[in-house]
Amino acid sequence: MRRIFILLCLLMVWTESALAAGNLGVLWDWQAPGEKESRRVQGEKLPGIDVLSPSWFIIENAQGKIKNRHGSVKYVRQAHNKGYQVWALITNNFAPKMTSKLLDSPLARKMVIAQMEQLGKDYELDGFNLDFENINPADKDKLTDFVEEISKALKHQGLIISIDVTIPSNSGYWSKCYDLKAIAEVVDYMMLMAYDEHGAGSEVSGSVASLPWVEDGIQKTLQEGVPEAKLILGMPLYMRLWQETKGKVKAKTLS
């Protein structure tokens, strides 16, 4: 997810195939560096949540080496015992130059996939959530190919593949890097990050995700060719407290 100070992001979809139940709730479980235990698998199961997506893995260089931050079989087994699936999050660390070099290298891409296959086995995962962001739009087709390669390889293990995308906009590195229709054809789910309408650095105060803005974003995404049954709406469980002084604004994030 784009901003690391977001502690939680609740993602929900209504679809006929979602866990064979019709409703799917996914909770992004961000674990801070050094955090050994997650609160999400402690205590009672959260109502309406079917999947936990812990922030465990980072592609840390152009050779495709994956850094394991928090991977835990104990976490997965606790989650399974409570009735959750676990889709571990893997990120490109929002590093556009590194990502370009990685996408240019068939060997590096194969290395990433091989490690993901092993991580899926080692941690008894149900799937992966791909959080690939801040990518050069010139790498758009290579990104699509890479996601397809990941999906084909890991589906042989029975793993679910989802990917995080932004609301369609004119932003090159944050939006136009995604071929939404083509990517939707090769993944199981597409997580639409319906935030931030007004970011922390905004020059005007406003909502993080107002209803009209979110609805418009959903429609734009569907118009790009993403099937409704694959679209997961990502909603922020945080807000901003704005302060205006002499025509300037600053924000404090609350979660």
Where are these regions (language model features)?
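Active-site beta-loop-alpha junctions enriched in small/polar residues
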Residues: W30-G34, F57, T91-N93, E133-I135, ...
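Hydrophobic faces of well-ordered beta-strands that scaffold small-molecule active sites
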Residues: N23-D29, D50-P54, V86-I90, F128-L130, ...
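Glycan-recognition patch characteristic of GH18 chitinases/ENGases
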Residues: A21-M116
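Sec/Tat signal peptide C-region and signal peptidase I cleavage site
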Residues: E16-A20
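Sec-dependent N-terminal signal peptides
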Residues: I4-V13
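Active-site groove signature of glycoside hydrolases
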Residues: W56, I113-K142, L192-V204
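Substrate-binding surface in catalytic domains of secreted glycosidases
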Residues: Q63-I66, H70, P137-S255
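Mature extracellular/periplasmic domains of secretome proteins
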Residues: R40-L46, I113, E117, C177-V186, ...
